[in-house]
Amino acid sequence: MRYTFSDEKKATTTTTSRAKSQARLLNSASYRRAARTTLRHSYGMGMWRAVALLACLSATHAALFTEGGAVQNGKDNKANKYVEFAHDDKINKEDLLKYYGKEVEQYKDDDSYMEYLIEYMKSHPVPAQFPNFEQEAEQEHQDELNQWLEQLMNEQELLEPANAAVKDAEQKAPLAPVHHKQVAQKPAQEPFDLDDLLRGELMLENEIAKESELKKTQEKLSEQTPSAKANVESLESAMQTATGEPQVPQKKGQNEFVSFVEQEPQPAKQTISSQTVDKRRLATSAEYSGSAPRYSSSSLLLLAVGTVMCVGLIGTVAGGTYYYKNNRRTETPDDGEYAPYAGTGPGFRKNKGNKGDETLAYKAQLHQYQQAKQKIICGEDAPGIIESDGEDGADEENNYSVYECPGLAPTGDIEVCNPNFAAQP
């Protein structure tokens, strides 16, 4: 009961505190200012309606009275015009589909379709051929030739009265003396032939084209580098020194005419061979000098860098191998270390040539081991001598360096006292 009463009391206190805080807020100046500044509900809804009306009015004004609107320059029904166009297009499309659909149904068969094509071709004339530009160029050239021939004929007609006057004057002139020879009169000129004129013009055009090509080649030769000119001059001078005659430029066919008319005396075979050898030597030397490899600075630099890199690589490999071997020698123990301290070790065994001492020492150790073993097995107090094998006996017959010591005490009388172990358990 105590707990429920206390809870109810706490709830009443919280509600009273909340009511007091709300009353304070309502009476505060900040709440009053906020109430004054905010719009009423009805007033705000009216403003939104006014804004919506203004937007509608502006849209209608833009649709009617602007450049793209319906009412501009007396076009009152422009807005409905596009609808009419769309409707007309729809009607036309339907009509075309109906017409072409029927037409296709009518001419499904091959024979009927061929008849339809023939009728269509008869009703529609064949269009004119496309222009042929090559034929037009030939026609223009022919027209120019005809004009040129007409001009020539007109000039001849104009010159005919002058020629007639000259002939009349010659006839009226006194006769020439007898000792003068009569000059043969020229035959009358035949009329011009168009084919001959065309051939002559073609020949002239070919000659003009050849001359232009020759000029181009001469210009290219003149534009060659000075090194090529120097090589040509050196070759000409070499040929001049070899033959003894200056190299003069000759016309086409001049060399053949001179060799045919003025036959030079042929020298002996030895002289011919010597001259040809000299010429060949000069030509080959000039050719080799012109075709010798010329290294640029970049290629020389690349060669130098490559050689330096190769030498460095070889040096590093050689140094690495030498260092590796030397380091291993220092790390591994030397075989000669064992020799100065004792007669054992690998150095002693390698350096010693006589093996007699080794065999003797080995046999002595073996003999001692066998004696100790026999004593342990038999349990004898006195030291007994055990005979070795036949081979050992045969080897020890002549061996007097190893002797048995008889003055040693027997091993059974010796007592060993170890302080770590108790005498009695």
Curated annotation (Swiss-Prot):
User: Where would one find the signal peptide in this protein?
Assistant: none
Q: Where are the transmembrane segments?
A: 300-320
Keyword Transmembrane in annotation = yes
**Coiled-coil regions, chain positions:** none
The places in or outside the cell where this protein is found are: Membrane
GO cellular component entries:
membrane; synapse
What coarse category fits the chief subcellular location reported for this protein? Answer: membrane
Which residue ranges are recorded for the region named AEX-3-binding? 205-424
Membrane listed as a keyword? yes
Per UniProt, the keywords (alphabetical) are: Membrane, Transmembrane, Transmembrane helix
Q: Name one GO biological process term.
A: ventral cord development
The membrane topology noted for this protein in its Swiss-Prot or TrEMBL record is:
Single-pass membrane protein
Entry similarity comment: Belongs to the NPDC1/cab-1 family.
Q: Could you describe the subunit structure of this protein?
A: Binds to the RAB3 GDP/GTP exchange factor aex-3.
Its name, as the record gives it, is: Protein cab-1
Task: Provide the species name.
Answer: Caenorhabditis elegans
